[in-house]
Amino acid sequence: MPSFDIVSEITLHEVRNAVENANRDLTNRWDFRNVQAAIELNEKNESIKVSSESDFQVEQLVDILRNACIKRGIDSGSLDIPTEYEHSGKTYSKEIKLKQGIASEMAKKITKLIKDSKLKVQTQIQGEQVRVTGKSRDDLQAVIQLVKGAELGQPFQFNNFRD
């Protein structure tokens, strides 16, 4: 039976490249001259710390980072950007988490979405991925289009397609 897996993964190497490109853009911006501003990647925690001297500049840094991610092919939906700032001394910062894997709540939403579509496929939640199995490739491709079209707040990839 044909099957495929729905996953949510980010290539950390591409994230590192995006952060380096954002830092390069930061050095070229005239509005950040003589300003303590930084974009730092923490690969252990899978997070990016954006810090600057004012909250407005932090928002500018987040936009620079978001554009760099899009240029590197990373969906900006995979960045979990908080609304509040961390403030210490004279620096404002935000800790942006990278969304990796599918949480159990999200996996249940995907499964419910697929079952509500009345397509003749079966779904299994396997850790941080969802396996979809069906009798025909057309049903599986319809599931792919269904999940791509749904606004679930997280980007998904479809891999391990077997016939």
Swiss-Prot record:
Keywords: Nucleotide-binding. One of its GO terms (cellular component) is cytosol. The keyword Nucleotide-binding applies. InterPro entries: DUF520 (IPR007551), UPF0234-like_C (IPR035571), UPF0234_N (IPR035570), YajQ-like_sf (IPR036183). The keyword Nucleotide-binding applies. It holds the Pfam family DUF520. It comes from the Bacteria. Gene3D superfamilies: 3.30.70.860, YajQ-like, domain 2. GO terms for molecular function: nucleotide binding. Belongs to the YajQ family. PANTHER family: UPF0234 PROTEIN YAJQ. Nucleotide-binding protein. NCBIfam families: PRK05412.1. This is Nucleotide-binding protein PM1656. It comes from Pasteurella multocida (strain Pm70).
